[in-house]
Regions:
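Short, solvent-exposed S/T- and G/P-enriched segments that are highly enriched in secreted/extracellular
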Residues: 149-154
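Short beta-strand-to-coil "C-cap" segments at the C-terminal boundary of structured domains/repeats
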Residues: 165-169
Length: 169
């Protein structure tokens, strides 16, 4: 079951290096079951890593827990996130994972979405400009805040957190 933070790293490693999959062997990669335990950022990262993986299979280890139940409702009520899974949008890694076993920045093949992960235990800025993608405006699907990506190529993320940006222009 996919419930530890290291499992999120494992999935990102698989999708970083597994893009030999071209829908001829398997139609979808397999993100495994997504659990919502741990803190909010970790649960969000598990959900978003499943989007990168290509499908969603949701479950939780304790849906009776009020905090986890709120987290489930919050994270799974974002229709645009669910549409990414429904539309089978494929993501590819766009950063070099020299010091890690996985990429931290992914772009959808249709260039409509960028996903950024901070898989460290500290808050940090993840920079994307060196990745060859130069979007101008991105909208964070979680906060609905628009970001001028032409003014900054770095995105501040809390420890073990992630975001999904819709590329506006």
């Amino acid at each position: 079951m996919f419930q530890q933070f290291k499992d999120t790293e494992y999935l990102l490693n698989a999708v970083t290096y597994g893009f030999w999959q071209n829908k001829k062997v398997y139609e979808f990669t397999d993100p495994d079951h997504i659990c919502f335990n741990g803190n909010y950022a970790e649960a969000k990262s598990r959900l978003v890593s499943a989007l990168v993986g290509g499908t969603l299979m949701l479950m939780s280890n304790d849906v009776e827990n009020e905090d986890i139940n709120k987290r489930i409702l919050d994270l799974t009520s974002n229709n645009e996130l669910l549409d990414i899974a429904r539309e089978h949008i494929t993501f590819v890694p766009i950063d070099e994972s020299i010091d890690r076993d996985f990429a931290s920045v992914f772009i959808s093949e249709n260039k409509k979405y960028m996903i950024i992960f901070n898989m460290t235990d500290t808050d940090r800025k993840i920079c994307t400009s060196a990745k060859g993608i130069k979007p101008k405006i991105g909208e964070d699907l979680f906060t609905k805040v628009k970001i001028d990506l032409s003014a900054t190529d770095c995105y501040e993320l809390r420890a073990r957190d992630c975001t999904v940006l819709r590329i506006v222009e």
